[in-house]
């Protein structure tokens, strides 16, 4: 984990050298970054490693089944709620694949910037037999994805190229890989220049219904 504050914005880079799978440890690192950013910075930029933003929940922990799997999914649900409810600008730089819970990370952010390349974005839960989606998943998909792509993304488990992910609603912008991080910083600074209290109030007002349904605390 690399967390730092530059020019009054927080930056959280996560890279486990593999698939950036969301297990208990990485989720705790996300909570730390969110808490620190909320108290010390005007916005937060998150960035996965080149090639893989996140491949989703850690299947080793999920495949333990029973209470272990349930605990991980519940912890993930709390993370996505925390991100979707984060009162300051939350920007993601995605330089690789974002699948399943990795795609939900993107859907939880305010502004998502991806890079071109042979990368896939999507929700593969139907394809791997994990249905129905947890409430956090259906709410994020309904809130952020284009209605025209909703069935293809959620029900049909279609994987999207960066260009199609932009149209579907997984991304807001595509940038050259070499420029991605600097563009992400610039966007976070731009959004952080907006009145902070108004930004948080506006975000929560338009997401209130989804946040209420997503809340499991």
Where are these regions (language model features)?
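CoA-thioester-processing core
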Residues: 99-152
